[in-house]
Regions:
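Conserved GNAT acetyl-CoA-binding A-motif
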Residues: 90, 97-109
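A short, well-structured alpha-helix characteristic of acyl/acetyltransferase catalytic modules
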Residues: 1-19, 23
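Conserved acetyl-CoA pyrophosphate-binding loop and the N-cap/start of the following alpha-helix
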Residues: 80, 84-92
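Conserved G/P- and acidic residue-centered "switch" motifs that form tight phosphate/ATP-binding loops
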Residues: 50, 84, 101, 113
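Acetyl-CoA-dependent GNAT
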Residues: 18-79, 151-152
Length: 152
């Protein structure tokens, strides 16, 4: 069996421990579109080996009372964490969202994923709440999450 993407225990949005590759991102886009949502994504690629080393996806409602905000999710390959890739992806995503007229950005991440919530806080997000046992991991553990948000 061939794995796609890359291993990261804290990835939330794929339903597995694999951060998405290009095909998974396209499938996620289609799934969002089927639910009256749309997405935009930014991907970091290592120039030397041409592999995806990080991704940032934002989803949004096309109409209704939630149309002013985006929900964000990201994953950075463990070998590339701490090198500013997440910061660059997040800043570019926020810049693009603001340019498109969105007013608010939100994300949810495992509390044990310190790198993720530190990235969010460093970029102006505030912790707005906690959810107990919000995620069920592939190995059967329940994980608490932070809800973070910021205005653009």
């Amino acid at each position: 069996m061939t794995k796609v993407g890359f291993e990261t225990k804290n990835w939330v949005y794929t339903g597995s421990n694999l951060a998405p590759d290009k095909e998974k991102i396209e499938k996620m886009r289609k799934d969002f579109a089927d639910k009256n949502q749309d997405t935009f994504s930014f991907i970091a690629i290592d120039k030397k080996n041409k592999k995806i080393v990080g991704s940032m996806m934002s989803s949004f409602k096309k109409n209704g009372r939630l149309r002013h905000r985006i929900g964000m999710g990201w994953g950075i390959h463990p070998d590339y964490q701490g090198k500013g890739i997440g910061t660059k992806l997040l800043k570019e995503s926020l810049r693009y969202a603001k340019k498109k007229g969105f007013k608010r950005a939100e994300a949810e991440m495992a509390i044990e994923n310190k790198g993720s919530w530190k990235l969010a806080l460093k970029n102006g997000f505030k912790i707005e709440g906690e959810k107990k046992k919000a995620l069920l991991t592939d190995d059967g553990r329940y994980v608490d999450t932070y809800l973070v948000g910021r205005m653009l």
